[in-house]
UniProtKB/Swiss-Prot annotation:
Stated name of the protein: Anthranilate phosphoribosyltransferase
Chain sites annotated for binding anthranilate 1: 82, 113
Chain sites annotated for binding anthranilate 2: 168
A Gene Ontology cellular-component term: cytosol
Free-text remark on how the cofactor is bound: Binds 2 magnesium ions per monomer.
Cofactors, names only: Mg(2+)
Example GO molecular function: anthranilate phosphoribosyltransferase activity
Pathway: Amino-acid biosynthesis; L-tryptophan biosynthesis; L-tryptophan from chorismate: step 2/5
Function comment: Catalyzes the transfer of the phosphoribosyl group of 5-phosphorylribose-1-pyrophosphate (PRPP) to anthranilate to yield N-(5'-phosphoribosyl)-anthranilate (PRA).
Length: 350
């Protein structure tokens, strides 16, 4: 496969086959492309728009080469991850939701990275909370078995992620790697809550998950109260577009905050802080269940709605509203905050 030929095809707006995309990702992972070539490729793909076949091929290659976390066959794990790069840049909702869901009994294998375009990614917030994020596959599996949660730092498990990280930072805009991160769980999670930065990705990404063998999933994009695309999370300030995947069938629905059992909140309260320390304060307030101000209540409610979806996907509750109620009870009992403290202590001693 010649790089020049592939680039000419992409710039002529010809879509790649799944196999071509697979082989192209192998070239990246094998170090056959320089930084300038990678930057040109990512830019051209972003301008053309990536297809389901292309994303599937890229993800399949990354999954094949990933350092695997060997999960016991009897354990059903759930992954909670967003693409990042959303317009609003909300605080670390999916990470808070993962902790709450794990405290409620869901086995959560969270796969993530540092922030690329924002101030604080999932890896950044967990590290700030005291978690050792650089665990290998055996230690991650031990964390999952002992605590019910593990964090897998993407660059340690994916050569491609580490290879393109400097290029992505320099480019500064969303690329296919924003989409690929949540699709390439080293734990091969068959259940997933995946937030996307653009509502037009909801259906295609659900198709990719199906192609990759995921059994049950929700792909979500949240809007603000004026129907503007806003966040790669379930929204509590406006509608959420959801792609439900179950039994190889995909259904697209629009849900409102009451469908998740929460009140309509205020968008301005969900915005990420400008520093890691500021985000950490928000994050810990949520896990502690603080809701004594409008801002704290809004941040807690969105975490509960997203945690509730994880509980629902894990089939611990029959409805999304029931999942949110279970998440609320978990936080009110103090279990979420205790798990966060245990997670930090456990991983530092591995």
């Amino acid at each position: 496969m010649r790089f020049e030929g592939i680039m000419n095809d992409i710039m002529d707006f010809r879509n790649l086959s799944e196999d071509e995309a697979h082989d192209l990702m192998e070239m990246i992972m094998d170090g056959e492309m320089g930084d300038v070539q990678i930057a040109a490729l990512l830019t051209a793909l972003a301008m053309k728009g990536e297809t389901v076949d292309e994303i599937t091929g890229f993800a399949r290659a990354m999954r094949e080469r990933a350092v695997k976390v060997k999960i016991p066959e009897s354990m059903r794990v759930v992954d909670a991850c967003g693409t990042g790069g959303d317009r609003f840049k909300s605080y670390n909702v999916s990470t808070a939701a993962a902790i709450i869901a794990a405290a409620a009994g869901v086995k959560v294998a969270k796969h993530g990275n540092r922030a690329v375009t924002g101030s604080c990614g999932g890896a950044d917030i967990l590290e700030a909370a005291g978690v050792n994020i650089e665990l290998g596959p055996e230690a991650a599996c031990r964390s999952l078995e002992t605590l019910g949660i593990a964090f897998m730092f993407a660059p340690l498990f994916h050569r491609a992620t580490a290879r393109v990280a400097p290029v992505r930072r320099e480019l500064g805009f969303k690329t296919v790697f924003n989409i690929l991160g949540p699709l390439t769980s080293p734990a091969s999670a068959e259940v997933q809550l995946l937030g996307v930065f653009d509502p037009y990705l909801v259906g295609p990404v659900a198709e990719v998950l199906r192609n990759l063998g995921v059994k049950r999933a929700m792909v979500v994009h949240g809007f603000d109260g004026n129907m503007n695309p806003a966040m790669d999370e379930i929204s509590t300030v406006g509608p959420t577009l959801v792609g439900f995947l179950e039994d190889d069938e995909i259904g697209i629905k629009r849900l409102m905050p009451p469908d998740f059992g929460v009140d309509v909140g205020q968008l301005q309260h969900l915005k990420a802080a400008s520093t890691v320390d500021g985000n950490l304060r928000m994050f810990m307030d949520v896990l502690a269940g603080l809701d004594d101000t409008p801002g704290r209540k809004s941040r807690l409610d969105i975490a509960l709605a997203n945690a509730g979806a994880l509980i629902y996907l894990a089939e611990m509750e029959d409805t999304l509203e029931g999942g949110t109620e279970a998440a609320r009870e978990t936080v009110e009992s103090g279990a979420a905050l205790r798990l966060m403290e245990d997670f930090a202590s456990f991983t530092q001693n591995l």
